[in-house]
Amino acid sequence: MRFRFVLFLFLFSITIFAQELVSTKSPDSISHWTKKNKLGFDISEITFVNWSAGGNSAVSGLLKGDFSRVYAKDNQKWVNDLSIRYGLNKQDGHEMRKTDDAIQINSTFGYRKDTITNWYHSAKFNFNTQFTNGYSYPNTQKAISRLFAPAYIFLGVGAENASKKKHRIFYISPFTFKTTLVLDQRLANQGAFGVTKAQYDSNGNSIVDGKKSKTELGFLFTSYYKKEIVKNINLVNKVVLYSDYINNFGNIDIDYDFLLDLVVNQYVRASIGARIIYDDD
């Protein structure tokens, strides 16, 4: 069982580069594609000089990108999203440490019976992994995670309700396959992230290597809510709940994301957020 809680706060964050195309359509009137591209780099710095109360000077950087391609025609909708995040922090007296690392790909195809209803018959694909090695600081001798170790793949069918007026989307799937990949043999041998660990003889020699994948069939619920609650203050709330039918049904894996984005101007912003991940395995 693992439980992770990440709380991050950027009091003064400067966006050095950002590009956003909220709704761009091809000049060709028959195109049904829209796209959104957003890339930014936030940096924050704290400096102490002869500060008697104590504290360490620190500098942090966060690269983030959000890209989407949406096809919509009549009763059909196909939404494709790519989200990347990579953050580093350097404090006096400490080595460079990673603060955020994520690659997320989502693709949802939906079909509704008419153009009035908000309900879609949907098929959904999700893929999540990371860029670089993760460590249990200050120990950086052995990685506790790597690219594709783990990686999570969700593939299933269900129903989605998308309401622009209510600024939310939720998806329910009674049949979703979840595959966990651990493409690092050392971590797989340890049984990391729920895969079957290696078997050893009485002398400690490996008899059977740990498995590098694990597949489950279960129930999936996802919810996404985004709204400008007041001018220049945006709220983003995401939750993913999954329970395996075969192993310990009722024990729920949770991935919860909360972000409050406060925009001062084009260059200065503050973000307050939290992420909670609970995996029963």
Indicate where each model-derived feature is located.
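Residues on the lipid-exposed face of transmembrane beta-strands in outer-membrane beta-barrel proteins
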Residues: 41-43, 63-71, 105-111, 127, ...
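Transmembrane beta-strands of outer-membrane beta-barrel pores
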Residues: 41-47, 73-75, 84-90, 125-133, ...
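Repeated loop/turn-to-beta-strand initiation elements of outer-membrane beta-barrel proteins
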Residues: 75-78, 115-120, 167-169, 232-235, ...
